[in-house]
């Protein structure tokens, strides 16, 4: 939380060394601090020195621009764009196409026919991940979106297993 930088740093230092923690999540809507705010820039700098993965919750007109800035400024960090920017999927896919450290996940209560296929066609399967928002949303709903997107078994395996394993740094990937 950018409003509580010292406390956030203390939490990162406490939890990130543990093997079951792989990164941090930023939800600027909850904190009320825009991703473009200088306080968020300070938080991101603190994260960059401690983590390898950041999940940024979608929301707000500043998100695409700040994602591009973060991706350029911190190329060693992997960024997961929560909900693939919601209804701005095309913009999210273009960002993921341009920045190899940006990844999309599509968990949401909005099925948006064709959004996963359209994103894949723009940025490639390597930039897509499975996200479920469990236990807020039944994972079967989200998995159904992937299963009904006309993807091959190899593409589904990449999204469900290979890409997350690589991005999360699991099993030495």
Residue ranges with predicted function:
Residues 26-31, 107, 130-132, 157-162:
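A generic structural motif
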């Amino acid at each position: 939380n950018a409003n509580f930088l010292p406390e956030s740093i203390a939490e990162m230092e406490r939890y990130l060394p543990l093997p079951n923690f792989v990164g941090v999540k930023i939800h600027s809507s909850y904190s009320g601090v825009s991703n473009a705010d200088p306080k968020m820039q300070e938080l991101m700098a603190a994260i960059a020195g401690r983590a390898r993965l950041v999940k940024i919750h979608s929301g707000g007109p500043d998100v695409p621009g700040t994602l591009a800035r973060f991706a350029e400024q911190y190329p060693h960090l992997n960024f997961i764009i929560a909900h693939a920017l919601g209804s701005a999927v095309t913009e999210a896919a273009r960002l993921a196409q341009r920045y190899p450290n940006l990844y999309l996940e599509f968990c949401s209560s909005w099925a948006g026919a064709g959004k996963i296929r359209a994103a894949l066609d723009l940025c490639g399967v390597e930039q897509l991940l499975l996200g479920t928002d469990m236990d807020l949303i039944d994972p079967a709903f989200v998995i159904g979106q992937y299963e009904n997107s006309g993807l091959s078994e190899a593409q589904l395996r990449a999204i469900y297993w290979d890409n997350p394993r690589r991005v999360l740094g699991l099993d030495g990937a």
